[in-house]
Every structure is written in C-alpha cells, then in structure tokens.
Amino acid sequence: MFLFICMTNLQLLIAKAIIEKERLNNVDLLFIGDAGNGKNVCYLNKIKPLCQHVSLEANVRKTSTFKTLKRTLYAKKIMMSYKKKYDVVFFANFHVPLIHHILSVISFDEIRTFDDGTNNINKKSVMYQDSSVPFSSKCFRRLMGRKYHKEDILKLDRVHYTLFPEKPNIIEKKEAITLICYNSVASGTSITKKILLGTVYSDAIDKKHEVLSLIQKVQCFIDDRKIDYYIPHPRELSYQFDNVENINSELIAEDIILEFLKQGLRLELYGFNTTAQI
C-alpha cells in the first residue's frame, strides 16, 4: 500500500508522474487544500483513476494555544478513512507540521519525497530556514502526539523525486521525474507570445501594505513589455490587469503553457521564479 499526501496542484501532477513511473498499485491519496477551488477538483479528478481512495481535506486552522494537541486530533480525524499501515508514504512538504502529525498517527516502512515547486532549489525558501527544536520541546510534543520534525524526515527520506536533477537540492538523494515529453511538442513557428506568470503578491514582499504599489508596478511591466497573456497564481485570483488577456482557467500554468507549445507558438515567459519558468 502506498500513500501520497499533496498540498498543491503541481504536487498532484508530480504524484501522478511517480505513480506511472513506478507502476504503483494500491495507492491512496490525501489532498490538503481548499475544497472550493476549482483547480483542486480538476486535478484531483485527473489522478483519481490511479487511486483506490482519495479525499480532500482543509488545512488545520492556525492557533496559538494547544496547537500540537489540536493538530494531532485533526490528523487522527482526517486519517480515519485511511489504512493504519503503508509500505511507502510520498509527500513534498517535509517542513509542514501537519504532515509530521499525519505520519505520527500511522505506521510506514519508508518515506519518499518530491519537489514542492522551486522551494527545494531556492535557498531563500521556507524549506531552508533553520527549524531546530530544543530536546525538551520535542519530548513535550511527543507526549502530545507529534513524533516527527523536519530533521527527522530528512534523515528518513529514502528517495527524492525532482523536476530539476541538475540543480542543487536541499535533499541529495535525487531521482529525476518528468512531467512533459517535449519531443511530442510541435517544433514551433515564428509567432512569439509573451506570458507573465503571477504570484501571491502579499507573499512576494515583506511589507504587506505595499501590495497595491507592487500591483501598479506589475501593470507598468505589462504595458512596457507588451505582455500578451497573464496567468494568475492559483492562490491569487483577486487581481485582473489591463491591456493583457487574463487567463482564468482550471488548468495550472504548466498545463496552459504546454497547450500553447502544442499550438506551435514560441513563448517568452516572465514571472517570479516559478516552476513553470524553469
């Protein structure tokens, strides 16, 4: 039995690629995210035929009191419909406490991880932040049901599947995984389209009150570069820009770009250091 835990649509695509590459059967999948997001439902439907059991659960609510105990209780609740024992558990977010709690309420023989977009190769990402926990705190958390922390996962990780095998990764035990077969893409024409990939703008800057200023700069960039298409981030649908075609689709950027390539278009990609660009 195999369990995949995903938190983004890109992770669902990678999970699907791993299942197909390794020819896995008896797969369960847990998706932690927004049930009201159409993209989540779309990509869950793509992977469902490869799985025995799939569920979509909301992320645990943030709280400052008894958070370890509350996460443990929540992990037990969402895992009630799953097996108690798995041969291998696959996931990307090895730094997320809820993942640690889920691992603590089941048993497994092996852990394998895969990329969370570019976070694994971006040394400024949250994955690279020091999260060492005092021994006394670990003991207390263990009493509350949390057996694992980030450093434990990194030690237990058997294999890491990556989209960027040639780049340094926070996890060294790498194995390449491919989402797109470029040989099947049309060779292209002389027509070039410019695409801007959006981001979560409140996450892109330190000072949250300057978001509107950043939005204005993005609009100026669109005008100056004569951008043809704007693809918003799945978690940032609040902003629409002028003088550009805003693409509102259930597909994620990687799939939208692939469709353009299949049409034979040449593309110039602009953005905020996203997986689709790399």
Regions found by a protein language model. Give the residues of each.
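Short, hydrophobic beta-strand segments that form beta-sheet elements in well-ordered domains
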Residues: 4, 28-31, 88-92, 111-113, ...
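Active-site and donor-binding regions of nucleotide-sugar-utilizing enzymes
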Residues: 3-143, 277
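N-terminal beta-strand-loop-alpha-helix module at the start
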Residues: 1-30, 185-186, 192-229
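Short, polar loop motifs at secondary-structure junctions
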Residues: 94-98, 231-238, 273-277
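A nucleotide-sugar donor-handling region in carbohydrate enzymes
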Residues: 115, 122-195
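Well-ordered, non-membrane alpha-helical segments in soluble/globular domains
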Residues: 16, 68-77, 98-100, 208-222, ...
